[in-house]
Amino acid sequence: MLYYPHIDPVAFRLGPLKVHWYGLMYLVGFAMAWGLALYRARDPKRHWTAQQVGDLIFYGALGLIIGGRLGYMLFYDFSNFIANPLTLFQVWRGGMSFHGGLIGVIVTTWIFSRRTHKRWMDVTDFVVPLVPLGLAAGRIGNFINGELWGRVTTVPWGMVFPNAGPLPRHPSQLYEFLLEGALLFIVIWWFSAKLRPRFAVSSLFLLCYGLFRFTAEFFRQPDPQLGFVAFGWLTRGQELSLPMIIIGGFALWWAYRHKER
């Protein structure tokens, strides 16, 4: 059994301003995405400029933050949102949803594609290899905050988290770091290294993320305000990941069936 190594969620202070590790992880994620995008943009076959990359990162960040927060309130805390809609803007209380962020990024990349006269599927194929490292950074932020812990376990690496009772739990944030971050990055970055049929890269991302998240949810403690949403075992995260698996699998088949580059 391990004990959570208490880490101050505040990384440093600038006068009265507190800079939290979680916020820094978002910045690290965006910085890594920007760097990887610039690296990929050097390939003339991809038809991207540095200016377009910078604009894309801005649109992506906007969609992620707005969609992530709104998605959390709608998917995970709807009753509180209806009772007090202003809680949407209380971002300091925490609460972000990947699935909401995904919807937000879909919208903003569509707007970006219209403004730059690029095909939306080409934009998403360029974006998704950048996403997993950002997800990895976010899960490290969750671990530093001691939040989103796992279910009670007897495995030797079970960890006692503050505010989670005396029993050891799965460090599910680290599982998600490995699955949705490191492993997903390796798979999608390798797959996208060659030019693939249009939307194949995006489809594989949807399929793999859905599978990895669905698996990780078996070790993660369900949100207390929701519990299990169906069958006595299905979580909200799994419920939202199922459409990704289905759509991703079908879209991958469709992309190779048409083989449009």
Curated annotation (Swiss-Prot):
Its main location: membrane. Its EC number is 2.5.1.145. A 1,2-diacyl-sn-glycero-3-phospho-(1'-sn-glycerol) binds at residue 139. It is found in: Cell inner membrane. The keyword Translocase does not apply. Pathway: Protein modification; lipoprotein biosynthesis (diacylglyceryl transfer). It is a multi-pass membrane protein. It holds the Pfam family LGT. GO terms for molecular function: phosphatidylglycerol-prolipoprotein diacylglyceryl transferase activity. The chain crosses the membrane at residues 19-39, 56-76, 92-112, 126-146, 173-193, 199-219, 227-247. The keyword Transferase applies. Keywords: Cell inner membrane, Cell membrane, Membrane, Transferase, Transmembrane, Transmembrane helix. One of its GO terms (cellular component) is plasma membrane. GO terms for biological process: lipoprotein biosynthetic process. InterPro entries: Lgt. It is an enzyme of class 2 (transferase). Catalyzes the transfer of the diacylglyceryl group from phosphatidylglycerol to the sulfhydryl group of the N-terminal cysteine of a prolipoprotein, the first step in the formation of mature lipoproteins. Belongs to the Lgt family. This is Phosphatidylglycerol--prolipoprotein diacylglyceryl transferase. It comes from Coxiella burnetii (strain Dugway 5J108-111). The lineage of its organism: Bacteria, Pseudomonadati, Pseudomonadota, Gammaproteobacteria, Legionellales.
